[in-house]
Regions:
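Bacterial N-terminal signal peptides that target proteins for export
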Residues: 2-11
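Short intrinsically disordered, low-complexity segments
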Residues: 6, 17-19, 98
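Extracytoplasmic copper-binding redox domains, predominantly the cupredoxin/blue-copper superfamily
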Residues: 25-186
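Bacterial N-terminal signal peptides
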Residues: 11-21
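Extended alpha-helical regions
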Residues: 1, 21-23, 96
Length: 186
């Protein structure tokens, strides 16, 4: 399936999701609970609504920056490595066991914040590096996979990650797989 068709299908699905809600989205006031602190991760992109929505349909990209976004041709030119304005910030985070991680989507597109064993491809083959590389197991079959569906972040939403055990945990966006970070739990 061509990249344009894959993204168009995702766009249609995402428009439906925006209208109906999602799994795994939490409303959090940013307070610490009895177990630890809340550490924030910001999920960012800078899509240009005119070119993204023109190609894939309304709602795929919202103008959240109020300024000029990255036009779709520039985004596509950055593939397969991925565009640097699509990222998790910070790229690494050190927390204490018992802390909660709050991933907040401040970008214009929908993303996932999915824990993976190893970094690799997402569920849109044309966005992988190398192109058409297989998805990592946690990202296979897109939103039909509960690991993906439960970690979906629509624009403006947040997701809480709790009970991380000691060690290094890897998170990636299953749509834009160059969006990656590591969380070290001490």
């Amino acid at each position: 399936m061509a990249l344009r068709e894959q993204l168009h299908r995702i766009g249609l699905a995402l428009v439906l999701v925006v209208g109906t809600g999602t799994l795994g989205v939490a409303d959090d006031k940013g307070r610490a609970d009895e177990h630890g602190r809340i550490q924030q991760v910001v999920v960012l992109d800078n899509c240009d609504p005119t070119t993204f929505n023109g190609a894939f349909g309304p709602g795929i990209c919202l103008n959240v920056t109020g300024g000029q976004g990255v036009p779709l041709p520039d985004f596509l030119a950055a593939l397969p490595a991925g565009h640097p304005q699509w990222l998790f910030y910070p790229a690494t985070l050190s927390i204490t066991r018992g802390d909660t991680v709050r991933a907040v989507n401040q970008g214009g597109e929908i993303h996932t914040f999915t824990e993976v064993e190893e970094f690799g491809g997402g569920f849109i083959p044309g966005l992988n590096d190398p192109p058409n590389a297989p998805a990592v197991p946690e990202c296979t079959v897109g939103y039909a996979n509960i690991s993906v569906a439960s970690t979906r972040l629509i624009q403006g939403s947040s997701l809480l990650v709790t009970d991380l055990q000691q060690g290094v945990h890897r998170f990636e966006c299953c749509i834009h797989p160059w969006m990656r970070m590591e969380i070290e739990v001490q």
